[in-house]
UniProtKB/Swiss-Prot annotation:
GO cellular component entries: DNA-directed RNA polymerase complex
CDD domains reported in the protein's UniProt record: RNAP_beta'_C, RNAP_beta'_N
EC number in record: 2.7.7.6
Binding site for Zn(2+) 2: 810, 883, 890, 893
Domain of life: Bacteria
Catalytic activity: RNA(n) + a ribonucleoside 5'-triphosphate = RNA(n+1) + diphosphate
Record protein name field: DNA-directed RNA polymerase subunit beta'
Family: Belongs to the RNA polymerase beta' chain family.
Amino acid sequence: MNQEVMNLFNPVVQPQAFDQIQISIASPEKILSWSYGEIKKPETINYRTFKPERDGLFCARIFGPIKDYECLCGKYKRMKYKGVICEKCGVEVTLSRVRRERMGHISLAAPVAHIWFLKSLPSRIGLLLDMTLKDLERILYFESYIVLDPGLTPLKDRQLLNEEDYLKAQDEYGQDSFTALIGAEAIREILRNMDLPKIAEDLKVEIAESTTELKPKKLAKRLKIIEAFMHSGNKPEWMILTEVPVIPPDLRPLVPLDGGRFATSDLNDLYRRVINRNNRLKRLIELRAPDIIVRNEKRMLQEAVDALFDNGRRGRVITGANKRPLKSLADMLKGKQGRFRQNLLGKRVDYSGRSVIVVGPELKLHQCGLPKKMALELFKPFIYSRLDAKGFSATVKQAKKLVEKEKPEVWDILDEVIREHPVMLNRAPTLHRLGIQAFEPKLIEGKAIQLHPLVCAAFNADFDGDQMAVHVPLSLEAQLEARVLMMSTNNILHPANGQPIIVPSQDIVLGLYYVTLMRDGEPGQGMMFANMGEIEHALNAKAITLHTKIKGRAWTFDENGEKVSKIFDTTPGRLILGQLLPHHVKIPFDVVNKLMTKKEISNMIDIVYRNCGQKETVIFCDRIMALGFREAFKAGISFGKDDMVVPETKPRIIEETSALAKEYEQQYNDGLITQVEKYNKVVDAWGKCSVKLADEMMARISAVQKDDDGRDKPINSIYMMSHSGARGSPTQMKQLAAMRGLMAKPSGEIIETPIISNFKEGLTVLEYFNSTHGARKGLADTALKTANSGYLTRRLVDVAQDAIITIPDCHSENGIRMRAIIDAGQIVASLETRILGRTAAEDLREADGTIIVPAGEMIEEIHVGRINAAGIQEVKIRSVLTCEAKNGVCAKCYGRDLARGTPVNMGEAVGVIAAQSIGEPGTQLTMRTFHIGGAAQIADQSFIESNFEGTVKIRNRHVARNTDGDLMVMARNVAVVIDGPDGTELAVHRVQYGARLKVDEGDKIKRGQRIAEWDPYTRPILTEIDGTIGFEDLVEGASMTETIDEATGIAKRMVIDWRLNQRSASLKPAMVIKTADGKVGKLQRGGEARYMLPVDSIIGVDPGGSVKAGDVIARISMESAKTRDITGGLPRVAELFEARRPKDHAIIAEASGTVQFGRDYKNKTRISIVPHEDGAEPIEYLIPKGKHIYLQDGDVVEKGDYIVDGNPAPHDILAIKGVEELAAYLVNEIQEVYRLQGVSINDKHIEVIVRQMLQKVDIVDSGDTDFLPGEQVDQLEFEEANIQAVENGGKPATGTPVLLGITKASLQTRSFISAASFQETTRVLTEAAVNGKADTLEGLKENVIVGRLIPAGTGAAMAKLRRVAVQRDELILAQKAETSEAPLVPIPHLPAAE
């Protein structure tokens, strides 16, 4: 019978409308209410008849018929008997589909514990009973008895007795004098008799009275779980099962294979074991078997049920016939292949195809070429309906035949169907939302999809065999969204940074660069032209070339915005390009009247987009693409080996550096420098040599050479490619023609012998071997990093998925302060770029008080110039970090939607966009590590240069002139300030301890002048007073070694770890400076001139030698320069987002005060800070010995200063300096990693993620709320509870914000469905069930999982409309109820969703 007809009889069931999903523990009654019958036999199907056995695991009587509307014995067939139950075989006549829905159950002969509540840490049963897991297992697995009621015996309540003790006690006190049980029955009894409210009261009292640190935490955990049971309506004894539910048979199928064998789901095996053991146990109990046998059987039953629920969680993994572990119910949910990630979040779609891509340069930006064969297949249903409508076919079958035969009318109809019906193209891996875009298909012959060249950057596609998938949006809404939101013409800007992503690359760039070249001495130089027609004529007549310097007329705009034509000094090529520019006041001809490199082209597109809008930009892009391709093809640029020019000075430079390296080797041999210092210096010298050669080569290649007749020779082709940004980088050119340079080992260290040859000369065998090292590392890294980066993206998406724009404005007064980021004197991120597209939090005024941007307005391009001109150094802007929206984020705090250049829309999923923007370059970069073939880039800063002209002021001027006459920085907080002529601070540079200052107070300084320099490879310890050296506790062999370098015979003193030896563990190695009278000198700030020496410091002076203030008395060697490469970067980003404590983290002062050194404690140094405030307790720090402590006794520190160097732990920054400082730190650190690779990401994306990491509060004082001290609660719950408490006249709770890493934050979201689908599924579900959690379906993931539209974008609007509709319905119903008595009143019109 036709399925359509069948469906007529089945009433259409409306999908159940629900607002939330709750999860709790199933009670035995609940399990029985689900069940359609008890399963008594382990049999599955009769292997001869293939019919299910009665009462077996596939029983048709319990689960329903195998064929639609047919009972098992065949007595009742067909629809007319629907609902009849056959008296012979007991099967209900209905659809076989019910075998996917109906459940059964197994009644257990003895209760068993649910393994999730027992073994999933923390053990819920253990917490409730306050017993250890070990004791619980001994009871449950029948090793010990537990006393339930001691009666009058001296036994204790809940005492554990082993078999012997139990029998002995029975003999001693009589059998009925006390009650002791064993197994799950015992635990069930205890759980059933628990008086939860009373226990909770007792615990609260105990917590209030407890004095120790740890006890309340432990008690609070137990109290929390008891309250969870009280509130959720779960009963503790339900954690022990008496009935086991059996899932429907079609979800654990048994399929006959050929050859009489069967393929079966593992669950059937697991269920069979449970049934077998249960039946055996029943028999043994009936037969009154000996206790020991029954007990053994009960233990085996417990193990069987454990394996069914979660195989391998306890004891051995149960394996099938082929030694493969069986997949239990828990495994069905867990992991990438589990139900959540494989089926609920990773559904497959139909109406899709995939094929190889080829370039389609003649396409428009909104088009893609779709092979006819593919289109015919994808649009079949549309073609059938159109054929039917036009009368070509009467039935679907006929239409099918027509399409199969590919009749000519089919192609005409295909054309009609496809017109204006967008398709979506996707290239895997889809790292950000631009990996799927919509295009209008254009039918082409062949089998490859044609892709527009300009969208390649967004897809990260190239044409070396990449494949792409095509998807057809079917419904009208889907087509509409594809056209309005996903069309390639709507995605011109990059969501990560707001720069154009539809940017010409490679050939197009080369063509445009070639067109806009200007050369001296070309024919026709200096001619004048009135219009383009004349120029074209002259070009055709070869009177001029594209590059001739001419005077030509072009349209532009004057100051008043009037269109005028002016004469420019330009070239014909530039005029041709200028013709393509849209006419607009803000886009004068000067935009194109220069040499076009990739960057210039990008700026040009940006200017066009910002001023002329999207449509003009798209047309313009298509035009310049055509021009670029045409001119590149005409130019015929290619290169040969002579284009790679090796500088003549190469042998000389190499010789000089080799001599330097030999000299360092000699110095090492003479014992003047250590091995590490020698290595650093040699590497440094070769690095400089490499740079010098590269510069010489670049100078040679880029130099313009003249012919004999004064005409410019054509520019070097390689230089053109690299300079224009079309292909190749200076690094690659350096390797081709200068020298390959330093290489890195796989461990990341730099090999000190560089590769002197370049690729043109060819490498020697040894050099080749060294270079394979780096290259291989690159390839290995690529594979590993792709996985790491993907995992980072997954965690980011998970933590940020519920950050959605929910309200237009939260009216927050707060914000964060932004200023330019200056690193080593270079402006890395200017103030303009950081505040553009953000909302001002306070009025920005010019010097005379006129408002540039009022508070609450967006800072646009027009304002930025004025802010700059007004000399404003710091701007307070609104940020998502300080947004006060209850759920999600408000539009004002977020600012501009970077991908559109307009204020962000309601419902935009900014969290996911942020996650993609941060994650996408991670993968890109990891895939990009090996492009420079492992050639080492040494990143080490050793000086500060001034960026401004001005006057020098030195803050906290602790300096001294040493023996060499250098000004040495003697303190940690010295800063060099450069003041402008009007006294404004232009820049502040913190100068590190031990640096040599090149300027002093009041000096005038020029741009590019050095302010200070230091040795990047060592950290010095300086003396602050003049005197002679004395050693303290520097004992040869115990705390110091004097190594005589075997190569040189020169002694070198070094501090060694003195704690390794018991005898010397109490030493405190130090150097003292003695004055003339032989006493230890006094420092100005009090305290003695005693300098503690950390492990591995190298002593640079002899005892008794005289020193001057500012001299280096010892130095600590820094680690050798590691190559910096995002390889180090990606783990760093992950470390920051996971908020891990770095290995050797900095110790930060928690208060401002004076430093005191205390008594040493074991092998730690004790430092305390005495705060300046009166009555404040000193704060103690224990610092492992051998760490270099920045401070000396008596120093004054500010809150937040470093005591011990290192990367600070983000938690410390949050605790000491607050949220704004923490955000600034995380943003800067993460940005630094990306900047190093030249990736630009807008700060707001990182802020969104940090906001998600700061959603929890640690309760300090619970006030009159239900919270427990030390508990972590959601910010939202915290605020709501406080409002409630204040309303009831109570005291609000206080708390401190907690920083959670992204994994932890994802697992602690309000939605348990989202958390379960992320990681640790079992743990999340166990906890949610105990708490009876309800998921209100607010985020994106949970809605995808339950199969709804996501509450973002158009889905948000739908959700809003649905809410409004429900409110109206309620009003109407309420009125109807009233109107049975009263007359109708008009319904008030509720505001619809915008």
